[in-house]
Amino acid sequence: MKIVTTKDNLQILHEDNHLIVVNKRVGDIAQGDNSGDKPLPDIVKEYLKEKYNKPGDVFLGVVHRLDRPTTGIVVFAKTSKALTRMNDLFSSRETQKTYWAVVKNKPPKEEDTLVHYIKRNQQNNTSKAHLKEVPESKKASLHYKIINELDNYFALEIELHTGRHHQIRAQL
């Protein structure tokens, strides 16, 4: 695999006629917010517009997002048909998303499935995990496995069964 880095430090991991896959860096935002920072889709659109010398607006569909303090692979659709197909794959759970996280302090078990009820606080953009259902909470489930450790830090491989707001951060 050849990684292409643009003048804006956009790292392109894959591109074809239908999709463009990029590495989202820590601090990049996957969609616009009130911070005034330029969202990753706008940077990708500028790249496509320049590369293909396209006048006017460039279509770019956001297939999925990652939180600002997270790095990882983000997939964008270059056509509406590709976006529909990718959305169908994600909603029918035909895709597999693997996450890696570093946590301080060892989890109780080497490998486990966690089930909580997550309540989102819109005002401060946080989520809190509860052991029992609380009003306006949503059930959240994930499976983790410790894959490495150093001092009191542990690298986990995580598979989400649900996709809740800040789920990994809230549950672990």
Question: Predicted segment positions?
Answer:
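RNA pseudouridine synthases
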Residues: M1-L172
